[in-house]
């Protein structure tokens, strides 16, 4: 059976793994490294360098050295994220004929799938060198929050590289697979996979269940940001260095392509060093020059300074965690393990933020650079028939539907629905003798069609003349295991059908997604606040009742000052529950809880003292009995009669 390799196609670095006979191995590339920089260089003579060799020559060939191409995949040139990247990238990003964001290098116009294919080809060659046989099939991972066109573009990249992509799987799911299969126990567990990579962020809540020796990995919910990652952290540091240098020297390094490339390398190195040290120094001699001569850059960066520069980026990663937990119907206390994936998750401040949110230390036994590729390789072995003890149940990240009469979106598939899935619904015409209908496919959470993301549209014609509402048009949405959407429409009267596979549409920005969800939830927010207020009030009243009872039973055992303190806290809590301020109720209940805790300790101490007194009486009674017992003296007698 042909081997199906697992590839983590990352924004900054990529990784390759193979699973055979239940054993998974990360494969080194031609340079002997376990990860490959996702950097591609186009040279004058037509030669293409990939990985470390491309990265090494980037300073002298900045305009033709492409990195972070994954950030452009499936995006339109006009997208604001692409426009933001244009300002900071040393290479040229152009608008393709179809409106997509492409790259220009050595005079050639290149699509992001084309560029990514070079990295995949290098992975393929490394696998073939290791196995000693031809490799044609692969499982490739993508961010969980990638949309249909981004997934399709990733499959296209595989095809360009000569690979039949058997499955596209989500990066957090792959990491959970690697983690779950590595655990020898059969314990059911819920894990949160926090995946902060080079260019994208995902959070997935996954349940790992043991089913008669087999393991089922079910994604309960997923969320994320396709434009948040280590590249953004690097950029914050680069911008800071540029600003400081401009203040000192009056020269803007943004205008110098070669200086930008040197700054990028220095910033990435400094960021990594600050994960283990408290301070690092950036030294870039001859960074630029003016009429007075060459200029040198020397700057000390502390960990605290770097953390302050990226504080908001870290905070941006926490909100999707909150949403994913809510969508999964869980609280932080329900999570058994927190797994960190992606190189940027090594940053201590990131780990602190994750620990603070989930209330538990993230696992340190998962390799953040390799776990995703390992999971992809395990899925590859499953697909090749090499193992059958694993079942993956992934989800679609956003709701999908069509525009119907009145400009509303009718959802056929809800967000976080397990895939593959299929849903059909019968619609009809809006006017008498209508001969054609336009099926407008949408993605999002809003009721109003125009407020959602348009994924594409197609027409179904030759509908037999009939009064409005009579024709029966069945629309079917089919999402395959790769998360790619296929839509079809069929006139049940004539059997006429039309269909579309969603591809080539631009990606969704995090802001668009957040706005869709927030707008849809706006009405539900007030109800939620009321429910939370009632819950807080009930908890506070239960505590008030409990403390009052304890005071009545044990108040005489407290000193006056302690009793007065508790009574004051009681009075404040009773006043708070009369109002509608949830924060005040919670605060006063907490204060009362602290005061009543001391009361509880005294009650416990009193009960313990009484118990000890009882034991002491028993001991005395026992000793009195012992006074009546006569101790016998024994003498050793030697028996000589043998």
Curated annotation (Swiss-Prot):
The modification Phosphothreonine is found at residue 200. It holds the Pfam family HSP70. Residues 628-642 have a biased composition (Acidic residues). The keyword Aminoacyl-tRNA synthetase does not apply. One of its GO terms (molecular function) is ATP-dependent protein folding chaperone. It comes from the Bacteria. PROSITE patterns: HSP70_1 (PS00297), HSP70_2 (PS00329), HSP70_3 (PS01036). Belongs to the heat shock protein 70 family. Acts as a chaperone. PANTHER family: HEAT SHOCK PROTEIN 70KDA (PTHR19375). This is Chaperone protein DnaK. It comes from Neisseria meningitidis serogroup C (strain 053442). The lineage of its organism: Bacteria, Pseudomonadati, Pseudomonadota, Betaproteobacteria, Neisseriales.
């Amino acid at each position: 059976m042909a081997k199906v390799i697992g590839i983590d196609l990352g924004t900054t670095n990529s990784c390759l793994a193979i699973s055979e006979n239940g054993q998974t191995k990360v494969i080194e590339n031609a340079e002997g490294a376990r990860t490959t920089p996702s950097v591609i260089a186009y040279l004058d003579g037509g030669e293409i360098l990939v990985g470390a060799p491309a990265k090494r020559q980037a300073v002298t060939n900045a305009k033709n050295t492409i990195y972070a191409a994954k950030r452009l995949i499936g995006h339109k040139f006009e997208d604001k994220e692409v426009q933001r990247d244009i300002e900071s990238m040393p290479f040229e990003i152009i608008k393709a004929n179809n409106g997509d964001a492409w790259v220009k290098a050595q005079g050639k116009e290149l699509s992001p799938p084309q560029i990514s294919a070079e990295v995949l080809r290098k992975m393929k060659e490394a696998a073939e060198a290791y196995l000693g046989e031809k490799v044609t099939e692969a499982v490739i991972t993508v961010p969980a929050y990638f949309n249909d066109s981004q997934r399709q573009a990733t499959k296209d990249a595989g095809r360009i590289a000569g690979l039949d992509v058997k499955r596209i799987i989500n990066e957090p799911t792959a990491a959970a697979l690697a983690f779950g299969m590595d655990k020898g126990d059969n314990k059911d567990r819920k894990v949160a996979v926090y995946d902060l990579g080079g260019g994208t962020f995902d959070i997935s809540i996954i349940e790992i269940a043991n089913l008669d020796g087999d393991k089922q990995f079910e994604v309960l919910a997923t969320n994320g940001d396709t434009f948040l990652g280590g590249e953004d952290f690097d950029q914050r540091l680069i911008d800071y260095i540029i600003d400081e240098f401009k203040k000192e020297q009056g020269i803007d390094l943004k205008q110098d392509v070669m200086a930008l490339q040197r700054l990028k390398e220095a910033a990435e190195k400094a960021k990594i060093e600050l994960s283990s040290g408290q301070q690092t120094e950036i030294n870039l001699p001859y960074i630029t020059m003016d009429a007075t001569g060459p200029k040198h850059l020397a700057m000390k960066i502390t960990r605290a300074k770097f953390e302050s520069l990226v504080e908001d980026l870290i905070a941006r990663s926490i909100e999707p965690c909150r949403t994913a937990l809510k969508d999964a119907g869980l609280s932080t206390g329900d999570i058994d393990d927190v797994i960190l994936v992606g190189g940027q998750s090594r940053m201590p401040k990131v780990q602190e933020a994750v620990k603070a949110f989930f209330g538990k230390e993230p696992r340190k036994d998962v390799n953040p650079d390799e776990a995703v590729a390992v999971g992809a390789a395990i899925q590859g072995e499953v697909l090749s028939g090499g193992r059958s003890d694993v079942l993956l149940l992934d989800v679609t990240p956003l709701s999908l539907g069509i525009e119907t009469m009145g400009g509303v979106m009718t959802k056929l598939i809800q967000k976080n629905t397990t895939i593959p899935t299929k849903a059909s619904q019968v619609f009809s015409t809006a006017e008498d003798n209508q001969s054609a209908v336009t099926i407008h496919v949408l993605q999002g959470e809003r009721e109003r069609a125009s407020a959602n993301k348009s994924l594409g549209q197609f027409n179904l014609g030759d509908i037999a003349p009939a009064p409005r509402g009579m024709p029966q048009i069945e629309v079917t949405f089919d999402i395959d295991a790769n998360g790619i959407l296929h839509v079809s429409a069929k006139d049940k009267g004539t059997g006429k059908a039309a269909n579309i596979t969603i591809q080539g549409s631009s990606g969704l920005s995090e802001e668009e997604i957040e706005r869709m969800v927030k707008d849809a939830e706006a009405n539900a927010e007030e109800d939620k606040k009321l429910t939370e207020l009632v819950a807080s009030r009930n908890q506070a009243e239960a505590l008030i009742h409990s403390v009052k009872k304890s005071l009545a039973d044990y108040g005489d055992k407290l000193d006056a000052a302690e009793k007065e303190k508790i009574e004051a806290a009681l009075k404040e809590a009773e006043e708070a529950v009369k109002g509608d301020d949830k924060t005040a109720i919670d605060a006063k209940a907490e204060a009362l809880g602290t005061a009543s805790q001391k009361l509880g300790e005294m009650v416990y101490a009193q009960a313990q003292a009484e118990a000890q007194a009882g034991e002491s009486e028993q001991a005395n009674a026992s000793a009195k009995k012992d006074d009546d017992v006569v101790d016998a003296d024994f003498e050793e007698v030697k028996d000589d009669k043998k």
